[in-house]
Amino acid sequence: MSEPEPDVKPNILITGTPGAGKSYLCERIASELKFEWLDCSKIAKEKNFVEEYDEEYDCPILDEEKLMDHLEPLMAKGGNVVEYHGCDFFPERWFQAVFVVTCPNTTLYDRLKERNYNEKKLASNIQCEIFGTILEEARDSYKSDIVFELKGETKADAHISIKTVKNWYRMWKRK
């Protein structure tokens, strides 16, 4: 494989169940690696990339097509840390690494309760974490050698996860 140009940076996806610790990691990883942090939920709200509102789960439903049209030119440049709680609709070509943040369901429950999730939404997200739905989705959507699991329960876990991503980046630059 040819060496990447010195100023070329990969795109990294950080995904996982809401409340697992994605934002904390993304903020620090983007800062330390000098990447752009693209929080897809925030972008969707700001740009109104919403198809409708789901009353049952008390949340907007993402217009994936509009989001992807918006992200395409940014992804072409590289150097992005993309955050979202799903991953199966992003083009595989966009990412050189996919990190899935996981968290024990008891910790996740407490975090989602703090966010005032309704009972149905809370139960759905806890079930998603228990069954490893996002990790399975990532493994089904991307090559296995670019999918990694990170722990998001504690600050110590987060520091280890940040080191893991930074080490991955160092190795990627050597290819």
Curated annotation (Swiss-Prot):
It catalyses: AMP + ATP = 2 ADP; ATP + H2O = ADP + phosphate + H(+). SUPFAM superfamilies: P-loop containing nucleoside triphosphate hydrolases (SSF52540). Residues 114-124 are annotated as: LID. It holds the Pfam family AAA_18. It is found in: Cytoplasm; Nucleus. Gene3D superfamilies: P-loop containing nucleotide triphosphate hydrolases. The keyword Nucleotide-binding applies. One of its GO terms (cellular component) is nucleus. Keywords: ATP-binding, Cytoplasm, Kinase, Nucleotide-binding, Nucleus, Ribosome biogenesis, rRNA processing, Transferase. Disulfide bonds: none annotated. Its EC number is 2.7.4.3. ATP binds at residues 19, 21-24, 115. One of its GO terms (molecular function) is adenylate kinase activity. One of its GO terms (biological process) is ribosomal small subunit biogenesis. The keyword Transmembrane does not apply. Residues 39-62 are annotated as: NMPbind. Belongs to the adenylate kinase family. AK6 subfamily. Broad-specificity nucleoside monophosphate (NMP) kinase that catalyzes the reversible transfer of the terminal phosphate group between nucleoside triphosphates and monophosphates. Also has ATPase activity. Involved in the late cytoplasmic maturation steps of the 40S ribosomal particles, specifically 18S rRNA maturation. While NMP activity is not required for ribosome maturation, ATPase activity is. Associates transiently with small ribosomal subunit protein uS11. ATP hydrolysis breaks the interaction with uS11. Monomer and homodimer. Interacts with small ribosomal subunit protein uS11. Not a structural component of 43S pre-ribosomes, but transiently interacts with them by binding to uS11. This is Adenylate kinase isoenzyme 6 homolog. It comes from Drosophila melanogaster (Fruit fly).
